[in-house]
Amino acid sequence: MKTWLFVDGYNIIGAWPELTQLRDQSLEEARRKVIDYLSEYAAATGYETVLVFDGWRVKGNRGSSLENPYIEILFTPEGVTADMAIERLVAGLPKHQKIYVATSDRLEQETVLAQGGLRISAMELHNMVFTQKEAQRARIARQPQSANPLDAQLDEAVRRKLHAMIHEENE
């Protein structure tokens, strides 16, 4: 069973303190940062993640998507809010999927619950993302460090050939 995470991008940017502060300087940078955070989270959890940004007030906007290896990023067309897009996407999923929707919009939360999804507030998602980030840092810190990190990843036969080549050049 797949686990899905749908995220209202601007709602998250408006709720997370570090993103709100960044948004006040550059909305583009705040979007990039939320994409980075959610990409890392999706890579670590395996959740099918869809990040939706409102484009509903942009005249003539047809909507678009961005390429990302870990998450799907959608910009809604004119007249379609992120909430509306998320509702449609959730309604179109096959039954028996685990679905989380991250938004602090009360009406959206109720709609998601009615469709069988689970709601996550913006701050709950914040805690989940940063708890995962910290757990990953701790795992990396516990791993033994090699003087040559590439050397530790090489197959023994390849390592011997490389060492032989290095010694031939030095002679």
What is each residue range found by the language model?
Residues 3-7, 11-171:
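Nuclease catalytic cores that cleave nucleic-acid phosphodiester bonds
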